[in-house]
Amino acid sequence: MGPKLLESRLCLLLLLRLVLMLASCLGQTPSRWFAIQHINNNTNLRCNVEMLRINRFRRTCKGLNTFLHTSFANAVGVCGNPSGLCSDNISRNCHNSSSRVHITVCNITSRRRIPYTQCRYQPRRSVEYYTVACNPRTSLDSPMYPVVPVHLDGTF
């Protein structure tokens, strides 16, 4: 049982590296991609408009996306909170926010196998705490923040 657990952890780490490399190829650091996908101070955002911005990078319809109505600096501040286990039950670089923020969850309503420019979304708005995974900044990130959010692990 031990070797299989080790193999699955190695596979997960390789997959994470691949995702980070893909983000770099798109000209985005993981923290910049996090900000593009999840940070938006406009509490009245229109899902169809904002998701088109994200889908242009992906060239496909993303099924679900959560926007945090806070600043990137506030999300970085969450990285200073105590760390804990992430939802993958392996990584331990997740941090819970200490206050709730307004969020908008955009859920796809159109068929996913259509041109990404035609995706349609339904918003769901609420006020929740959130969890982010944080990593040391890359050389391409601002030196202002030594540790940055790279993944929205969930809301609660």
UniProtKB/Swiss-Prot annotation:
List, from the UniProt record, the residues annotated as the active site of this protein.
H38 (proton acceptor), H151 (proton donor)
Which Pfam family, an example, fits this chain?
RnaseA
Signal peptide limits = 1-25
Cysteine pairings via disulfide bonds: C47-C106, C61-C119, C79-C134, C86-C94
Residues annotated as binding substrate are K62, G63, L64, N65, T66
List the keywords (alphabetical).
Disulfide bond, Endonuclease, Glycoprotein, Hydrolase, Nuclease, Signal
Q: Name one GO molecular function term.
A: nucleic acid binding
Which superkingdom is the protein from?
Eukaryota
Carbohydrate attachment sites? N41, N89, N96, N107
Q: Cite the PROSITE patterns for this sequence.
A: RNASE_PANCREATIC
By its UniProt entry, which SMART domains does this protein fall under?
Answer: RNAse_Pc
Which protein family is named in the record? Belongs to the pancreatic ribonuclease family.
Return the protein name: Eosinophil cationic-type ribonuclease 3
